[in-house]
Amino acid sequence: MAMPYASLSPAGAADHRSSTATASLVPFCRSTPLSAGGGLGEEDAQASARWPAARPVVPFTPAQYQELEQQALIYKYLVAGVPVPPDLVVPIRRGLDSLATRFYGQPTLGYGPYLGRKLDPEPGRCRRTDGKKWRCSKEAAPDSKYCERHMHRGRNRSRKPVETQLAPQSQPPAAAAVSAAPPLAAAAAATTNGSGFQNHSLYPAIAGSTGGGGGVGGSGNISSPFSSSMGGSSQLHMDSAASYSYAALGGGTAKDLRYNAYGIRSLADEHNQLIAEAIDSSIESQWRLPSSSFPLSSYPHLGALGDLGGQNSTVSSLPKMEKQQPPSSFLGNDTGAGMAMGSASAKQEGQTLRHFFDEWPKARDSWPGLSDETASLASFPPATQLSMSIPMASSDFSVASSQSPNDD
């Protein structure tokens, strides 16, 4: 393309470059005429006619100017070392929240700071629903999300409630059966006043009947269980079995006299001894003299028997002190005082009964008031004779009734 000659001149080239630069900067800058009249003013008029009028460019909006002034004030507080007032900080925080929502959008209900939980539109209402549109209309409990009706509905109620209150009070059935035996409790509670250890009787029934007498020194108020019929012996077996089970379970104390006096005693031997004595006592109780065959009214000098046994007292109902010797007499010096007390009481009782024992006839055949049936019973073989157990401590009188009728 051939260019005109005039455009090659330096002056023409300079004018062309200036006009092109002015035309390109018109939309962004406000051009002012260099002179009131001249070629440049006309060119500006032509450029303004060709391009629309450009609006003034403002660097900040009014809100940005206000925020800038606020930040400048906060900066002055920071430089001065004075705490920034909260009314200057709160608007900035709100502006940041609005900026986050503008750029990142509104968080959906299933996500965000609640980590998958949905926002409750009615916080004070029970949250029990059926999974659809229905929701409980009652108010929720203070410390729960549900009302009183729906609070425990989510738990499995098919099982029976566990009784936690009875758990610490429960005990093994064997221990419960042992604790229910009153003679054993009485025997365990009996203590001696001087020695300081528990004195368990060999026979729990005797210890239960004596009260506070225990097994040592209580010969004055001991009522023998062997003077009764087979019912008393069965009760003795039950009480002794309860004591054996109690000792086998470890309930007996370490100072139980049956096991710690001279070594461990066999339970089988002790049980066999009890059975033999019970059979012997049952045979003796069957051969007791009936109350009608030996009335006390016929013998006024035997009035002391009325004090011992009442109206129905017989010869066989006299206290059997021989079998009720203290079972713990092998203890030695610890029970010496108890033995002395028991022998003294037995001797006193023997002296009380002495005045009529000597007056009795030697042979049973000469006893008045005995019927033929009683006489036939008296002529029984000597193996089953009636043995009266008189205390051995009273050695100053002889037992005449212990002799057999055949030994005249």
Curated annotation (Swiss-Prot):
UniProt remark on domains: The QLQ domain and WRC domain may be involved in protein-protein interaction and DNA-binding, respectively.
Ranges of Basic and acidic residues composition bias in the record: 139-149
Subcellular localization: Nucleus
GO CC annotations, alphabetized: nucleus
Keyword Metal-binding found: no
Domain QLQ residues, every copy: 59-94
UniProt motif (Bipartite nuclear localization signal) ranges: 125-135, 153-160
Biased composition (Basic residues): 150-159
Complexes and interactors: Interacts with GIF1.
Protein name (database record): Growth-regulating factor 1
Domain WRC: 120-164
PROSITE patterns linked: QLQ, WRC
Gene Ontology MF: a single term: ATP binding
Renumbered residue ranges of the record's region Disordered: 139-178
Pfam families per record: QLQ, WRC
Tissue: Highly expressed in developing leaves.
GO biological process: DNA-templated transcription; leaf development; positive regulation of DNA-templated transcription
Family matches, as InterPro entries: Gln-Leu-Gln_QLQ, GRF, WRC_dom
Comp. bias intervals (Low complexity): 166-178
Described function: Transcription activator that plays a role in the regulation of cell expansion in developing leaves. Component of a network formed by the microRNA396 (miRNA396), the GRFs and their interacting factors (GIFs) acting in the regulation of meristem function and the transition between cell division and cell expansion in growing leaves.
Similarity remark: Belongs to the GRF family.
Assigned keywords, A-Z: Activator, Nucleus, Transcription, Transcription regulation
